[in-house]
Amino acid sequence: MVLGVVGISYREAALKEREAVINILKTFEADTLLAQRFFGGDGSFVLLLTCHRAEIYYFSKSNANVQSKLLSWISSLGTRPYCYQGLACFTHLFTVTSGMDSLIFGETEIQGQVKRAYIKAKTDRELPFALHFLFQKALKEGKDFRSQVSLSYPVVTMESIVEETLDLHGKSTKDKLLFIGYSDVNRKIAKGLSAKGYRNLIFCSRKNIPIPYDTVARSQLSFGKPYDVIFFGSSESARDFPGLSLESLAGIPNRVVFDFNVPRTFTLVERPEGISYLDMDFISERVQKKLQISKQCTNKEKPFLALAARKQWEVYEKKSSNISLSQIRTSRPKLLIL
């Protein structure tokens, strides 16, 4: 039996490489036969795909070569993925969920991203006990960690990077800002800009929910209208929007476009002219320049998470052992009394 993870993050790969890895990992969701070949009939997986990481957590009863196959496939894209099994897999996901492995040290969004990845996986397919236990305990320990350990608020945030960038491009609080998608990242950016005095914030979302900002319906959306800044954060590609192209975006002079989607809304061969197109690589580079993560702080908190991971790993081993024994007993043929 193998429980493990293979993946890449912003440390190992640039945005273009992460996009390629995300695309191949998504094939497991689209091709059930491929998933069975990799993980076996009793195995399964959870994909954790965010702006800064692409990971597949897997369990297989029968295929001990899963890790080497995944490593070979991802490495063929020119990347150098990391991998962990058993206790190390527990420790890694606990560290990720707590925000200790994030680009912005201690950020809280990752907790929700891990939760949504787990919910999506268990909704889409049957998960084995191992993956249920791993993710449930990671979410629990991540929450407990934040409540027990005092972390200073990140000095650098995406909101501050966006605000600074708008200033550098000569944008003002009177400009019109269009947000495509009512996603976590768009809501966070809008909230931060609203606090700084930006008032012309307009959302366009597929969701039929109350939104505390001005809205425009998808049927009425036009990129030819004078939106000074556009934020893409809906996990959709350009082909999902009729009439959307880099040329249409460039129709408004000095327009600034933030593309928070990974994979990106546009597949770029070269940087477009006429607009300032800023993707997650731009955000990551700005954050890394400004944010110097304290290794002393990181190392100080790691034993807490490592201890929690070992504790839950030992519980998992006992529970999985009991499950195996129970399965063995129930599979034995009953003796006939003659």
Swiss-Prot record:
Q: Which GO terms describe its molecular function?
A: glutamyl-tRNA reductase activity; NADP binding
The metabolic or biological pathway listed in the UniProt record of this protein is: Porphyrin-containing compound metabolism; protoporphyrin-IX biosynthesis; 5-aminolevulinate from L-glutamyl-tRNA(Glu): step 1/2
Active site at: C51
Q: Which reaction does it catalyse?
A: (S)-4-amino-5-oxopentanoate + tRNA(Glu) + NADP(+) = L-glutamyl-tRNA(Glu) + NADPH + H(+)
Q: What's the further remark here? A: During catalysis, the active site Cys acts as a nucleophile attacking the alpha-carbonyl group of tRNA-bound glutamate with the formation of a thioester intermediate between enzyme and glutamate, and the concomitant release of tRNA(Glu). The thioester intermediate is finally reduced by direct hydride transfer from NADPH, to form the product GSA.
* Protein family per UniProt: Belongs to the glutamyl-tRNA reductase family.
Q: What name goes with this protein?
A: Glutamyl-tRNA reductase
Species this protein is from: Chlamydia felis (strain Fe/C-56)
The gene name reads hemA
